[in-house]
Each structure stands twice: as structure tokens, then as C-alpha cells.
From Swiss-Prot:
Annotated keywords: Cytoplasm, Glycosyltransferase, Purine salvage, Transferase
EC number: 2.4.2.7
Role played: Catalyzes a salvage reaction resulting in the formation of AMP, that is energically less costly than de novo synthesis.
Name listed for the protein in its UniProt record: Adenine phosphoribosyltransferase
Gene Ontology, cellular component aspect: cytoplasm
Gene3D superfamilies reported in the protein's UniProt record: 3.40.50.2020
Taxonomic source organism: Ruminiclostridium cellulolyticum (strain ATCC 35319 / DSM 5812 / JCM 6584 / H10)
Length: 171
């Protein structure tokens, strides 16, 4: 199955000129979702050994949590500022028009733990860069980063040099 064919393109969303790639068409198709998760597992296995999977709010949760379950690893959510109930570590990152902040629980990753970052989309790499900084602030080691979709023209990998990066579908 070609998962690229299962994705829906929505023009001019969320603003004019954007070709939004909608993953819900894959999620609602059991066969496509299963294929997607098996592809994630294959990529994850190529990244070497790791202890935990980190996923960013919110679509990183969609793929990261089931992958962690499937691979018998822990899952660590990274959330937007103010959404986690315990002590956190925070990292600011750039958005197209401004800045935002991501947080992780301060005890989510032990020093030396190996981490795989999972997300739905690699565009500019800003969100992933913030995730990497959070993991490393806690003493974790990022062993790999895997995505469902990669937008090659935005050159997000440029911000991730030195890290093992792969994606299932490339546009």
C-alpha cells in the first residue's frame, strides 16, 4: 500500500497558499493505520536501541504512544506550556509568526536514557529542535527521530544535523 495515496490534501488550510496534508484519512482506515504503524516500527528498529519514545502534542501522541506500546517502551508526552501537572522543563521555539513553548516533566527522562522522538510531520524542524533540547536538558540521548511525513522543500533536516532522521512519506 502506498500511504501517500491515502493522505488528503486540503488547499488553503489553515491559510491561503498552504497545501495541508490531512492524516485523518489514514487514521480512519484500519489497514492504512496498521501499515503506517508497522512502517514506524521498521524505521524505529533501524535507529538502534532506545528506552523511551517522546512525542509532541498532539499528533506526536497519535503515533508515538501506540508505537511505544507495540515496542514495549515507555512513552513521554511533550506538551504546550501549562498543560503538564508536575514540575517541568521548558523550551521556547520559533513559529512562523512568533514563538511558543514546549514542556516536559522534569523527571520524565533519567540521565543516560536513550530516546526516540516520534512526530507526524517534519517541516522546518523547529518543534523537533525544541524536543531535542528538552531531552538533552534532562540528560537523555536522542538516538533517532522518525516522522510519518517529511516536507523536503522546507529543509527541516538542516536543523537536525548530527541526528539520525527518517520518514515514511516524503513530499
Amino acid at each position: 500500500m502506498d500511504l501517500k495515496d491515502k493522505l488528503r490534501h486540503v488547499m488553503d488550510f489553515p491559510k491561503e497558499g498552504i497545501d495541508f496534508i490531512d492524516i485523518t484519512t489514514v487514521l480512519q482506515d484500519p489497514e492504512a493505520f496498521r501499515e503506517c504503524m508497522e512502517s514506524f516500527k521498521t524505521l524505529a528498529e533501524k535507529m538502534g536501541d532506545f528506552d523511551l519514545i517522546v512525542g509532541s502534542e498532539s499528533r506526536g501522541f497519535i503515533f508515538g504512544a501506540p508505537l511505544a506500546y507495540r515496542m514495549e517502551k515507555g512513552f513521554v508526552p511533550v506538551r504546550k506550556k501549562g498543560k503538564l501537572p508536575y514540575k517541568t522543563v521548558r523550551e521556547e521555539y520559533d513559529l512562523e509568526y512568533g514563538k511558543d513553548e514546549l514542556e516536559i516533566h522534569s523527571d520524565a527522562i533519567a540521565p543516560g536514557e536513550k530516546v526516540l522522538i516520534v512526530d507526524d510531520l517534519l517541516a522546518t524542524g523547529g518543534t523537533t529542535e525544541a524536543n531535542i533540547k528538552l531531552v538533552e536538558k534532562l540528560g537523555g540521548e536522542v538516538t533517532g527521530i522518525v516522522y510519518f511525513i517529511e516536507l523536503m522543500s522546507l529543509k527541516g533536516r538542516d536543523k537536525l544535523k548530527g541526528y539520525n532522521v527518517d520518514s515514511i512519506v516524503k513530499f
